[in-house]
Curated annotation (Swiss-Prot):
Protein name: Ribosomal RNA large subunit methyltransferase M
A family per Pfam: FtsJ
Active-site residue list: K303 (proton acceptor)
Subunit-structure text: Monomer.
Species, as recorded: Xylella fastidiosa (strain Temecula1 / ATCC 700964)
Organismal lineage: Bacteria, Pseudomonadati, Pseudomonadota, Gammaproteobacteria, Lysobacterales
UniProt: S-adenosyl-L-methionine binding residues: S186, A219, P220, G221, G222, D238, D258, D274
Signal sequence extent: none
Gene designation: rlmM
Role description: Catalyzes the 2'-O-methylation at nucleotide C2498 in 23S rRNA.
UniProt similarity note: Belongs to the class I-like SAM-binding methyltransferase superfamily. RNA methyltransferase RlmE family. RlmM subfamily.
Disulfide pairings: none
Its EC number(s): 2.1.1.186
Subcellular location: Cytoplasm
NCBIfam families: PRK11760.1 (NF008734)
Keywords: Cytoplasm, Methyltransferase, rRNA processing, S-adenosyl-L-methionine, Transferase
Amino acid sequence: MSGLIAYCRQGFEPELAAELRDRAVLLGIASDIHAQRNHGFVLLRCDPLHVDTLLQQLHWRRLIFARQTLRLHAELKTLNSRDRIAPILAALPKTPCFGDLWIEYPDSDMGKPLAGLARSFGNALRPVLRSAGRLSAQLHPQWPRLHVCFLSGDHVLLGSTRSVDSAPWQLGIPRLKLLPEAPSRSALKLEEALITLLTPNEREAKLRPGMCATDLGAAPGGWTWVLICQHLRVTSIDNAALRPPLLNHPLVQHVRADGFRWIPPRPMDWMVCDMVEQPRRVAERMAVWLREGWCRHMIFNLKLPMKKRWDETRLCLERFETQAAVPLTLRAKQLYHDREEITVYASNDAR
């Protein structure tokens, strides 16, 4: 069996399946995609000769609806609860030796009850793999990592990935803690966006103390708070009030205005936007900000409709890129802390 495993948000399996199918077609690769709603993952099966190409081109950072992508090695069904280890050992590829082991389960209503089994099974499997020479005694991040994904007590997917090419969190979910002083839980969305959509080097270069930012539709202030934690000076645009600790903060200027109509008096380094509005309208307004040179970098959310979400995603991103009319770095992702939405990062490469 050859192909890919891709984790996603429960309920967005059809969107991920459509994204994978379209991307494979563009690459000229025939694929068989299996997705069931609310299962939290999608399987893509293909000719073994094409797996490496797909893993490279369908990297988790390049996919919008995938939290993690893995090389699929085997699917094991009807496992005996008295001995799950022997069939797993037998199904592993002859090479390589793995440098790490993650025992996982889908982030879904069916998968979450398997968390206890995953923890205990990892403790049992790890020493056996090491004794068999299939797992290094010490962590080796440069070696492939083995993923054992439980779909049920007797149903397992075996996959692998290179640590440097994969999401660095189990299940593809970053574990972020909401600090008590954060004005709202929406702060977690921007925090996750910064660590997911930007590389460490990009964060260091593009989020420097003293930079200027605008937060459109800022109230109650979750995204503004994240920016001032990065020591940026923020102009928060909203007719509604901001919550403490943003009131009278030296890095925050609150302007009571409509975020869709306000124009900055000078170019900004950053603009962020999490307004609840039709996604096409948001995409068009964001494009204006880049086209007019009002900012260099931006992060914004697109609230998706209940139906045809993949079609709407493609349309909005294509319209945004066309109307921005500047050279762009463009990345989009449905984050763990997103709901019926995606988060987009765009940067004007010409400035």
